[in-house]
Amino acid sequence: MNSTEVIILAGSLILISLIAYYSIKMIVDKNRHKAIMEVFNETLPQVVLEKSNERFYEYQFLNADKLYLIKVLPFDIHHELIITNKYYWCMNADLKGWKRSTVPDLFPGVKEFVDLIPATTLKVVKIALIMPDCHNIIRYLNESDVAKVLPSDLVYGVYFVKSVDLRSFFPKTE
């Protein structure tokens, strides 16, 4: 093989890899959207869940004179969410071996979501929706103490709710 053939082969492999990656990402996103719509249709059939045009949250809806903003956090059931401070939410895949010195797997757009003040007179409720579920949601209270976060806990202006807890969450916020 000469250098031209190698370049064409490498370019083809890169192109095929990119197409495969974006195809899989599109399928996963479509399935997640479908699952979210099903959860909300079962929980709140009267609301119209709209996809957001914003980059840092995915959905919004109006219910009982409140505007709900939803940031979706895709999770594995065996991982946990650790809220280290207002702007750093990280996924922990190693439940027993995690330390504060562990390199975090941070969620993007958290600062923008937490600091967002929409131009509305309605009360705004921000929800971080964990899809489909996670092992634990914990937050650091200080350097050494942590607390388990419940769906009813307002943490830095955001409710952290697992999709399996969504049905029990809404009666508590009305």
What positions do the PLM features span?
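Surface-exposed interaction regions that form or flank ligand-binding interfaces
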Residues: M1-F56, F61-L69, L73, I77-I83, ...
